């Protein structure tokens, strides 16, 4: 059986040798050129291949049509990937009749993605393993062929676990490859509900937070110990790296980051003390803990710190277009609560963000994105993360002004996306739950659910398809030109400053604002088509916390992902929302200032929205991606959200207006 192999690192060497030992013919090996900036402590696949007389290549882009054609000419029966760092295109995966198979360093479906070796140690796992699985378009998601478990000892560090995994991989391959060569290839589907995803790790991820539990800090030290970059902290402006440590008994009443003793060198964490066994000051040599304390000038009672402001690390610059909107102003507040963010914003008004205008890390320009293109391009280039939040997003406008919806929601935002591509900036783009349209799934899955819309003569769908098309364009830019992106899909976020009662007066507001206006003015609450449409209402605080975590993007887990942000537990019909709102209104201390309740009125959607409208019976999100990528769960009950939203709007009504 003829094989083409994609391989790198020690695992790549083990895989190549195992394939040869199993009697396969290797037509060619594809690998990577070593990066001079990387500590190449591992074996060289290219040297191994050259020594064996096997053709070896290291193309910059193996998925280029030229290389796809060359691989096709090799006519492989089977393809193997052993720690090759790039995803293979579907064109390559389909070239081998027997299939393409990848060796992954975890027990799938757990720890899909990058650096599973390090992540299992960071998370304090007691077991991991290696898995050979069939390759499909989604990384690490194909059917499992075979796996082998590896116990993680308490004294294991990254390098010792790496050696264990290499040994386990060789045993696994020696066992399964002869069977596969005979055409017997087991296939067990992965359980998606058990899948977890992790992104790549960077050297800066080794920064120690002494306010974490001591086991967490110790596990970080284990996970990135040499030859990885190491866990580090600061004494003043002096950086030092901890190469080995142990957990000590509780350090009661000691502030985290405080030096408890210098011989041995022990530092307080949230619930105990970390003893530093070996470490290194700056670029110096590795020494034992007490000598490190002497080198750093530490004494008992000294406080270790995070990197000083003068260390040269600048704040993350976030550009928010539509900063005065509902999401924009709440997100600005969340970002400014963190010291390491600076916010640049543009909008056509500033009423919702007036509380930030004098903030030293908030920079606002009043303007229109369709006019001020030069300002926008300059600030896309200047900033690190871009959020184009400007959109017409109220249903009545879809039928009133479909062309304006398309021009703003698609054309203007496409220009911004192209700036992000041009300057290689990360974009966090607001898709919408509307893209699912009339999907019939019980809950809408970002990666599986079909996006179903109505006929062309229903302009109500112009918003949905504009957003969906932009989602697809962004995805294509990510695939073809390396755009870093995350698409997030809000599901009926509610809260203070959602919009305004004036917007509701002209019919251009969200549902709850329109209902509140009816209560304030003593007009009947209109239930469109009886108000039986179900939605999952999400508190703005829950939504913004998820969005903030997307911006933080720990471990790059959100790159290239679509993430629903909604609360499946808060599902209610519009009629149920109106009833809950009325109950809260009757109990509110300002109730006496407003007219009597005028009752409910059932109206047809055609008479309210126009002939181009078409409604959706339900809209419920799957939030598995949010759980995996963000570690996020919504927690705020719908009643709490309704009461807070109502209170905000009632207190915004002028006293004179109440009396009238």
Swiss-Prot record:
Pathway: Nucleotide-sugar biosynthesis; UDP-4-deoxy-4-formamido-beta-L-arabinose biosynthesis; UDP-4-deoxy-4-formamido-beta-L-arabinose from UDP-alpha-D-glucuronate: step 1/3; Nucleotide-sugar biosynthesis; UDP-4-deoxy-4-formamido-beta-L-arabinose biosynthesis; UDP-4-deoxy-4-formamido-beta-L-arabinose from UDP-alpha-D-glucuronate: step 3/3; Bacterial outer membrane biogenesis; lipopolysaccharide biosynthesis. It comes from the Bacteria. The record marks 102 as: Transition state stabilizer. InterPro entries: Arna-like_SDR_e (IPR045869), Bifun_polymyxin_resist_ArnA (IPR021168), Epimerase_deHydtase (IPR001509), Formyl_trans_C (IPR005793), Formyl_transf_N (IPR002376), Formyl_transf_N_sf (IPR036477), Formyl_transferase-like_C_sf (IPR011034), Lipid_A_modif_metabolic_enz (IPR050177). The record marks 140 as: Raises pKa of active site His. Residues 1-304 are annotated as: Formyltransferase ArnAFT. The active site is at residues 104, 434, 619. Gene3D superfamilies: 3.40.50.12230, NAD(P)-binding Rossmann-like Domain (3.40.50.720). NAD(+) binds at residues 347, 368-369. (6R)-10-formyltetrahydrofolate binds at residues 114, 136-140. GO terms for biological process: lipid A biosynthetic process; lipopolysaccharide biosynthetic process; response to antibiotic. Residues 314-660 are annotated as: Dehydrogenase ArnADH. UDP-alpha-D-glucuronate binds at residues 393, 398, 432-433, 460, 492, 526-535, 613. It catalyses: UDP-alpha-D-glucuronate + NAD(+) = UDP-beta-L-threo-pentopyranos-4-ulose + CO2 + NADH; UDP-4-amino-4-deoxy-beta-L-arabinose + (6R)-10-formyltetrahydrofolate = UDP-4-deoxy-4-formamido-beta-L-arabinose + (6S)-5,6,7,8-tetrahydrofolate + H(+). Keywords: Antibiotic resistance, Lipid A biosynthesis, Lipid biosynthesis, Lipid metabolism, Lipopolysaccharide biosynthesis, Multifunctional enzyme, NAD, Oxidoreductase, Transferase. The keyword Transcription regulation does not apply. GO terms for cellular component: membrane. PANTHER family: BIFUNCTIONAL POLYMYXIN RESISTANCE PROTEIN ARNA (PTHR43245), UDP-D-APIOSE_UDP-D-XYLOSE SYNTHASE 2 (PTHR43245:SF13). Homohexamer, formed by a dimer of trimers. In the N-terminal section; belongs to the Fmt family. UDP-L-Ara4N formyltransferase subfamily. In the C-terminal section; belongs to the NAD(P)-dependent epimerase/dehydratase family. UDP-glucuronic acid decarboxylase subfamily. This is Bifunctional polymyxin resistance protein ArnA.
